[in-house]
Amino acid sequence: MKIIAFLGSPRKEGNTELLLKETIRGIKDSGFSVQIFNLNSMNIQPCQDCGGCDDTGECIYHDDMDVIYNAIRNTDRIILATPIFFFSVSAQTKLMIDRCQCFWCEKYLLKKPLQPGELGRKGLLLLVGGMKKDIGVQCSEACATAFFRTISIQEHSTLSFLGI
């Protein structure tokens, strides 16, 4: 089983990273490996909404997203770990999600959705927030759900840790 994880926190060794590491430790204890993408340290340009991916499903800009695109295409499980900033996912996480517009075009315009593979594609959303209110979870969940559906993940779980 292929598993990838996106770390969307700008804080090195922050709460989001610590929780992701614990999650990955459990996965490794089960005999699987995880490819981690630290979004804060990657060279990812923002989506320009240029329409360049409309006809091909491929982004015309080439940066570290090229590696992410390949990983998303070939994975069975995706972990999206992000702090909650201003009631949503972090800027680093949103930047990566926005650049997945090419998958949206591929799925909805070109009618070529990513295939679920033998194991099916599943996701996990890990959220960490300082506030104790659920509004940040709800807004982050909406963003993550749109992302997961775009990349053919129909089933995902959410773990949220608030007030830390």
What is the predicted function of each stretch?
Residues 1-105, 110-113, 159:
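N-terminal beta1-alpha1-beta2 submodule of the flavodoxin-like/Rossmannoid cofactor-binding fold
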